[in-house]
Amino acid sequence: MPDKFKRVHVIVMDSVGIGEAPDAAKFGDFDVDTFGHIAKHVGGLKMPEMGKLGLSNIREIEGIEKAEKPLAYYTKMQEASNGKDTMTGHWEIMGLYIDTPFRVFPDGFPDDLINQIEAKTGRKVIGNKPASGTEIMAELGEEHVKTGALIVYTSADSVLQIAAHEDVVPLEELYEICEFCREITLDDPYMLGRIIARPFVGEPGAFVRTPNRHDYALKPFKPTVMDALKDGGKDVIAIGKISDIFDGEGVTESIRTKSNMDGMDQFIDVLDKDFNGMSFLNLVDFDALFGHRRDPQGYADALVDFDGRLVEVMEKLTDDDLLIITADHGNDPTYTGTDHTREFVPLLVYSPRFKNGGSELELRQTFADLGATVADNFDVKMPEYGKSFLKDLK
């Protein structure tokens, strides 16, 4: 590939794994396959655009034809880090290796942490267990409205979430509480990946979350490829929750989104901008609305909707653009429980410059190969981990 690309666009389909990783059993996962099991559940997925790129060339997905001449280079990536959460996946994509997993609290948080929150805020804590946000809001929302107590809960991820009605706990107060929780959980014994403010509105029986969610992540422990790009004078446009995942590090512009389709709208708007660097989009609905809630039909519909938007994306790309579509972990909605699943993730790499289409790339042993390729393209500092496949794109 003689000329470098002016713009690289990375789309992370949050949780869209493509089959069980070799070490899945170590993570308690057996026979997991997000893409495959969704397709089977609905009797085949209709995703012609992803099909043309070469999705079923990676491995066959029911309903999606294998492309005779795939438009994209294709393979799958294996996660090297010791985790299967959003932060671990994204940080590895951008060149980090996470050896010590973020802590999870399947039985709720220790009394010491809860006592600190109550002492600081003057509010009681209710909940303190793993739960779906919508379910715990329905279960404890009325008590919260009556008493002003904070609904604190966790999930299978390394996360502490605080739900509060906007008329009971004003947004600024909720954000301040979450900032305090962030400060006291940065290190052992808690070492939480994220604190999330989960505001809601409405009446008992009809509570609904607002778009004013805010994530407080850990800062990456080392510079990522995003930092290298920013330091090298390149643009890093973070769309969706990307800026939250990296706690703003290495980001030159952040664009919030309200849904997958809003994310695609924002991304398509970014394609109209003249910039030199990377756009980085996370589509969280796959994970948050359908994976954790074990809703394979909803997940399938969201995949089909995403595929439909790729037509607009492809129309806007030029020979100066490189599009990379991948995921950060699995979340098989047909599997037991509500946790993420340890899986390979798809990798599709496309540019209109590939006049003869794409072909199979070698299996990537770490997500960091993606970040290394981006760094290689822009001639910035290479990450410690990862092997660029830029030279394989012809």
Curated annotation (Swiss-Prot):
Compartments where found: Cytoplasm
Domain of life, source organism: Bacteria
Record GO biological process: 2-deoxyribose 1-phosphate catabolic process; 5-phosphoribose 1-diphosphate biosynthetic process; metabolic compound salvage; nucleotide metabolic process
Main enzyme class: isomerase
Major subcellular location class: cytoplasm
Cofactor: Mn(2+)
Binding-site residues for Mn(2+) 2, renumbered to this chain: D287, H292, H340
Catalysis performed (reactions): 2-deoxy-alpha-D-ribose 1-phosphate = 2-deoxy-D-ribose 5-phosphate; alpha-D-ribose 1-phosphate = D-ribose 5-phosphate
Annotated Gene Ontology cellular component terms: cytosol
Chain positions recorded as Mn(2+) 1 binding sites: D14, D328, H329
EC numbers on record: 5.4.2.7
Pathway involvement of the protein, from the record: Carbohydrate degradation; 2-deoxy-D-ribose 1-phosphate degradation; D-glyceraldehyde 3-phosphate and acetaldehyde from 2-deoxy-alpha-D-ribose 1-phosphate: step 1/2
Cited Pfam families: Metalloenzyme (PF01676)
Keywords: Cytoplasm, Isomerase, Manganese, Metal-binding
Function noted in UniProt: Isomerase that catalyzes the conversion of deoxy-ribose 1-phosphate (dRib-1-P) and ribose 1-phosphate (Rib-1-P) to deoxy-ribose 5-phosphate (dRib-5-P) and ribose 5-phosphate (Rib-5-P), respectively.
Family (UniProt): Belongs to the phosphopentomutase family.
HAMAP family membership: Phosphopentomut
Protein name as annotated: Phosphopentomutase
Gene: deoB
